Amino acid sequence: MIKKIESLEILPPKNQLELFGYENYFNSFVKLYKKNKLPNTMLLSGPKGSGKATFAYHFINYILSDKKINKYSIENMTINPQSLSYKSLLNNTNPNFSLLENDTVGENIKIDKVRDMLNFLNKSTYSSDIKIILIDNAEYLNIYSSNALLKVLEESKNKTFFFIIHNSHSKILDTIRSRC
């Protein structure tokens, strides 16, 4: 029997508590992470609204809630809304996480944002040595931002992870694509 959905509420990716359709990818990422073989830079490509950012937020939540109470449920692909890592990601207050995105839809991501990210990377964290950067709408990086990001990607440390999300493959510099 098909379940009828009475009302569907569309939430921003970081507010989505359940992950649908990415189970195999998620489990593959978890295996790589547990074996310390997860790449430092991951490029998530696809059409807008396909779940790339939701996937990234779920995996970031998994990493940041690792070994803590109220941790991420791999079996159900769900975020515990009581989890400190979820609450701090939701409020953008997690000291191990930085979000890089354009301020206004359709505007370029300026080099100042990349410099802010660099400052974040140079600060120490209080709870772990992991740093996670989510770059959303990466196709809006201008040439200066892209080149600054490229330098950061080349010099990234072992426990620093970049999730680069974009909707238009052709607008990403080949040199950035080659680092992912």
Roles of regions detected by a PLM:
Residues 44, 135, 149-150, 166:
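Hydrophobic residues in beta-strands of the RecA-like P-loop NTPase core, especially within AAA+ ATPase
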Residues 144-155, 170-179:
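Short regulatory helix/loop adjacent to the ATP-binding pocket of P-loop NTPases
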